[in-house]
């Protein structure tokens, strides 16, 4: 069939991959297509395993084109020092913030990471956690259905901190949302709150339902990590 590549033929595969690289470069740098640049990154990572070059394309596509998913991936590169970049959490935070503010497949995860870095505090000027900023970005991510953000919010309101008072109503609200999204410990925490009447009306029946959900999620998680067996 005309145009089909025989992937058993080494020469055809080599030619196909070379053409793909040329095409990706053309779309990125000649047609100024941000999605084309991101496809070039996929090619460099997945086919060439050239992470240094991928980092350069990501920097270009994030800084020049404000491409959300490129900013997210560049942030991840900065977190680990991948692609020849110097490990830099502040640079990572800036990248995640750009990704959070622009629509993209990774926008919600980027908002969570902004919250996470603000919560950790290393990227802040005083080196201390910025709980207000963490709350704001966790909330954005949680509203987008990001489970870990909902759980982190529940923990923040459950524990409280100087300048960040406890709020058991909100702790319960976010525990329930994280539980609905499948977070085991959120279900367990919500169950305990209802069992003890800790900040909410005591409801042992609801506590039991939540405990059972936590146990079911735990069983499902255990099934997911069972080793393969051959009989």
UniProtKB/Swiss-Prot annotation:
InterPro entries: HcpB-like, Sel1-like, TPR-like_helical_dom_sf. Keywords: Acetylation, Disease variant, Mitochondrion, Neurodegeneration, Neuropathy, Repeat. GO terms for cellular component: mitochondrial intermembrane space; mitochondrion; nucleoplasm. GO terms for molecular function: protein-disulfide reductase activity. It is linked to Spinocerebellar ataxia, autosomal recessive, with axonal neuropathy 3: A form of spinocerebellar ataxia, a clinically and genetically heterogeneous group of cerebellar disorders due to degeneration of the cerebellum with variable involvement of the brainstem and spinal cord. SCAN3 is an autosomal recessive disorder characterized by onset in the first decade of slowly progressive distal muscle weakness and atrophy and distal sensory impairment due to an axonal peripheral neuropathy. PANTHER family: CYTOCHROME C OXIDASE ASSEMBLY FACTOR 7. This is Cytochrome c oxidase assembly factor 7. The gene is COA7.
